[in-house]
Amino acid sequence: MSHYFENDNNIKSNERIIYVKVNDIELKFIADNGVFSKKGLDFGTRTLLENVNIINSNCSILDFGCGYGPIGIYLSKKFNINVDMIDINKRAINLTLKNAELNKVNVNAFESNIYSNVSKKYDYIVTNPPIRVGKKILYQILFEAKQHLNKNGELWLVINKNQGAKSLLVDLKKEYNAFVVNKNKGFYIIRAINN
């Protein structure tokens, strides 16, 4: 069985248009088979976008696991900023580039297996992480983020209570100044500051 966090060229393409409105920002996306949440913006990502707080529009942002691009494109549109976006999935990167053009935003989207192709540090890393990769890889994603954050840089993520939000928060507090910003229907929005 194929997953959205893998490259599978055998998945038949079936592109569709998705319309999204978050915090009065209207966006249009092309989604496809083989990417996460292909039928519409998922509740966890929506909750993350409704809560993420970028206080400096002159900052650097990385969207980790960008899928077809809703997080990075939304942040680029809202804050009028260039966002770097990564995913291991080639189809996701291609969709992100199409969607950036469709929404008239500046992003830099590229393939990366976790942080293998990330060479700089960011003020913000924002993610709805791929929980289904398993705890070991999930923790690698979240704890290696520290090496790609500037001092006082922030990791923002969403995770469901049923997917281990409470235990993850305990573990994040060992490496970051981490806390819950908001909870909504079992989804935790976590902000982890690299200090």
Predicted regions and their residues:
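Class I S-adenosylmethionine-dependent transferase superfamily signal
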Residues: 75, 144-145, 172
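A short glycine-rich, Lys/Arg-flanked "PGG" loop and its adjoining helix->strand segment in the class I
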Residues: 139-151
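Conserved SAM/SAH cofactor-binding pocket of Class I
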Residues: 44-127
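Conserved beta-strand signature within the Rossmann-like core of class I S-adenosyl-L-methionine
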Residues: 152-159
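N-terminal auxiliary segments of SAM/dcSAM-dependent transferases
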Residues: 1-22, 34
